């Protein structure tokens, strides 16, 4: 079973489609472990919680530099021991370290 993390920025319509596909069996051998947003108020986080999925936010405004934000994002993702990251409307340029890792 693949442990999947979904990165989002907004309402989460793409996330909902993925959740629905997992529930219906259209996507097999995968479990959404966490939804991470760069916005604390993203409705996608509500969608995650309503479906029993961990919901986290890592907001760039909470950090004094982009490098510290990148480090925090990678640390948050790593804490879930994920096999795969899905970008579902994540409106942040990914740090090269994250791309190399996943």
Feature roles, as predicted:
Residues 1-102:
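One-carbon transfer enzymes
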């Amino acid at each position: 079973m693949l442990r999947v993390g979904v990165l989002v920025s907004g309402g989460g319509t793409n996330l909902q489609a993925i959740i629905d596909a997992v529930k219906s069996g259209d996507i097999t051998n995968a479990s959404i472990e966490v939804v991470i947003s760069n916005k604390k108020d993203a409705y996608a986080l509500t969608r995650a919680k309503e479906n029993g999925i961990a919901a986290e936010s890592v907001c760039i405004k909470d950090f004094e530099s982009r490098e510290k934000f990148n480090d925090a994002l990678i640390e948050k993702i790593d804490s879930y021991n994920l096999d795969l990251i899905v970008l579902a409307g994540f409106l942040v340029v990914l740090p090269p370290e994250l791309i190399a890792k996943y």
